[in-house]
Curated annotation (Swiss-Prot):
Disulfide bonds: none annotated. This is Membrane-bound aldehyde dehydrogenase [pyrroloquinoline-quinone]. Residues 1-44 form the signal peptide. GO terms for cellular component: plasma membrane. It comes from Gluconacetobacter polyoxogenes (Acetobacter polyoxogenes). Keywords: Cell inner membrane, Cell membrane, Membrane, Oxidoreductase, PQQ, Signal. It is a peripheral membrane protein. The keyword Signal applies. It is an enzyme of class 1 (oxidoreductase). GO terms for molecular function: aldehyde dehydrogenase (quinone) activity. Predicted to be exported by the Tat system. The position of the signal peptide cleavage has been experimentally proven. It is found in: Cell inner membrane.
Amino acid sequence: MGRLNRFRLGKDGRREQASLSRRGFLVTSLGAGVMFGFARPSSANQIFPLDRSLPGDGAFEPTIWCSIAPDGEITVNIIRAEMGQHIGTALARIIADEMEADWSKVRINYVDTDPKWGLMVTGGSWSVWMTWDVFRQAGAATRTAMVEEGARLLGTTPDKCTVASSIVSAGGKQISFGDIVAKGHPSHAFTPEEMAKLPLKPASERRLIGNAELKALDIPAKTNGTAIYGIDAKVEGMLYGRPKMPPTRYGSKVRSVDDTEAKKIKGYVRYLLIDDPSQVVQGWVVVLAESYSAAIRATDALKVEWTPGETIHTSERDIQDRGRELINNKAGGVYIFNDDGVDQAFGSAHTVMDQEYTCASVLHYQLEPTNALAFEKDGVYEIHAGNQWQSLILPTLAKSLQVPESKVILRSYLLGGGFGRRLNGDYMIPAALASKALGGKPVKLILTRSDDMQFDSFRSPSVQRVRMAFDASDRITAMDYQAAAGWPTGVMAEAFMEKGVDGKPYDQFAIAGGDHWYEVGAFRVRALRNDLAEKTFRPGWLRSVSPGWTSWGVECFLDEVAHRQKKDPAQFRLELLTGQGRNKGQAPDSVGGALRQAAVVRRLMEKVNWGKTSLPKDTAMGLATTAGQERGMPTWDRCVAQVHVDRSTGVVTCQKLTILVDAGTVVDPDGAKAQTEGAALWGLSMVLFENTEIVNGMPVDRNLNTYTPLRIADTPEMDIEFLPSTEKPMGLGEPGTTVVGPAIGNAIFNAVGVRLRHMPVRPADVLRGLQNG
């Protein structure tokens, strides 16, 4: 097949399984090194070789986390996708710190799919949070095994040994991890009970976690050009493909194809009609050529006529009107909270506030367009692509190819941006089916920017209705929050949906954030699934998912309530962050609950001198505080945005963003800051600059000539601070996005008295608000 360009940082290896806490841990000599990993408790007394073959049946397979070579090199195996966030470095810090590794000898390896890794997904700001406990235990077990064998080689006992920087020392003698591997025979199987008793380092003894001096392990490869992204993958003899896209995402059928003009283009080979048994890809035509430039030109020259699907005339307004219809219908939906007394409180209320908030469709627009290389080799289909949810697309690929899942393997690469787009691996399907149609010949499918935007799994337009009831003394007695949008998890991963209090499944990524941490009396949260949205496009998970738009409604509404009650918005929030009842929080993930959110609010008030700073005319601060991404794993954020509004043009200029974060233990300080900066700028982009509109069933924008995300010239000053903490680390890839939009919306009101309830905010909206007084 020829030499394949693959991305590797370190040696080849393997990784995890699902219920990690129920696994034992294996240490075994293997070949020229030592492997470390978790194993099923039923096999904890056995030693298994590392399986470097294609996926097997999964029986009694260890889940391998790291290896130590005779030269002392330590390879940490990573199942999370690297898309600019340096996740490999963060996770390697955890295991290396606990094992007392020499950081200069640590390497990271991004593994390919195999059943032994269990759930492979990178999203939801989960990676560090999900890996923290298991990698600390893995590091502790590795350290223990090295000390045990090191003590034997030094002629002493483990209790007389110390270990630091990959060196075991005792009685004036020492031996390195590498020499222990080369000269000894480390082999120890830990039962789950033993694992639970292994001593873990206290925060005061950590050398790598939280160390701001360490550099990301993947920077050299990314800066010297040796890092390989999915778009770089190639093999000898492959054909290049580009899809000809139908007029609707679903239901379009090819009536005729004319390739007369395409045949005139040098390098054109043929076209293929894609028939996808999974029905994810409908009505696509793939053009094949000897070069990508030829594929682009031939696709443009190809003439295809379709019978379009039923949503050919659907608009953004139609979808939002459908959302309103669903909200106004008391039947249907799923209740996440449904306290007793909500209807009674509204029925007897002295005053009711009732507002609607809407958010537009937003595209991912990642730098690297979606692409995939597919071919069959020895009866197995290999798919080479960057992807965020390998475990989700593998069964779909198997269904599309009509082969067992064991006959499909996904090779991992760096991602030139993900932001949730590559959680949906639909772009691999036409490449795989094209290869199958050619008898397994390699096909490299690359979507152009326009292709990628046309069938992006973008953020659904949404409608929120927020109501609050007050008694005669103006005390809050109840809150009713409802939101309607397309459900990405419902469309692509139904098994991952949670159950509401009424026992019905719902998409937590289409309502999270509405279930906030404020004390508001009787509280009801209802999620509604916009069926018209899902018929029109494939809703996707976009960075910050629902908290990126639910927070717009919740936090802007709370500011409106504060102003109505003539209270300072920050002090008003503090009154509601009592940390009582369900908002108390629980160990280990939400320790402190709303009281930690309140602490973030207080610290930021001090930091920005809230309410005491004199600013020029039409310039003001606004605030928002959130607990993204989910109640089960909250990152406590608060943002103060300072904006200036030009009354003559309606242009809003964000001058400064001040963000305070309590994310528990910060594992990688530089990465944490970079993630928060990027997330905040993403939030700024979505509130002031970026959105698309659905016209005739499709996003109207196809490139940067009309799609206008944040530019460098519009980037404000940023001041980001993390509260010191030794609690379990939470996510950082998305929470910073959630607070910026509402903080800016509230700042606009404070600057010029215009309350805007649609995101994004456009100059015309500001001018209209000014004109209406």
